[in-house]
Amino acid sequence: IICDEYKYLWQGIGKADSIVFNPHKWLGAQFDCSVHFLKDMNVQKNTLSLTPEYLKTSGVEGITNLSDYTIPLGRRFRALKLWFLIRSEGLSGIRKLIRDHINWSEELFHKIKLLKNIEVITEPVLGLFTFRFINQNSENINELNEKIVKEINDEGLIYLTPTKVGEKLVIRFMAGTLEMEENDIDVAYECIKEKSERT
């Protein structure tokens, strides 16, 4: 929602009761940092609030007790991580990070779909896409991909995660770390290309 060109992906979001996203997964905030938007905060308050006599605030109306919105009565100050990220990178820096990651992922997607022994499973959405290695001589393509993901991750140049699309074990690619640079896409491409040539 921070980049205008991707706001179309949020169409219909007004029908949702809540939205959660994790800035520690993509935006570079320190772990753990989640953001939770609620349409009606009273629903969560009614679910989670615990008000024994010793916690009641008498004679004061309209006080928001944040302990009413979480299971524990106290809260860590997680918002500070996000505040520091926004202060250090700025909204323009965060937008650039998102745009770069999406563009770099799309660039990699278009390169690897031309490789032999690669089957693209899903197109990139916000920089995330899936693919798998194929080999007509392999009896079990899922096992082949599981083995290749382990090899790639053990080498330590890039890190990929497997998932399932239907019954197919596929490989997820997502550009998404604060320190990532454009040449890291070249490293990922060479790594995937080398495996596709050996498959």
Annotate the PLM regions.
Residues I2-C3, L9-K113:
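Active-site C-terminal subdomain of aminotransferase-like
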Residues E119-I152:
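Conserved PLP-binding catalytic core of the aspartate aminotransferase-like
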Residues E107, K111-L115, K147-I158, C191, ...:
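Generic non-transmembrane alpha-helical segments
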Residues V165-T199:
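PLP-dependent enzyme catalytic core of the Aspartate aminotransferase-like
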Residues L128, D154-R172:
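Conserved PLP cofactor-binding pocket of PLP-dependent enzymes
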Residues L115-E123, P162-T163:
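Flexible, glycine/charged-enriched surface loops at secondary-structure junctions
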Residues F84-L85, T130-F133, I171-G176:
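Short, hydrophobic beta-strand segments
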Residues K25, S88-L91, N135-N137, T177-E181:
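A generic structural motif
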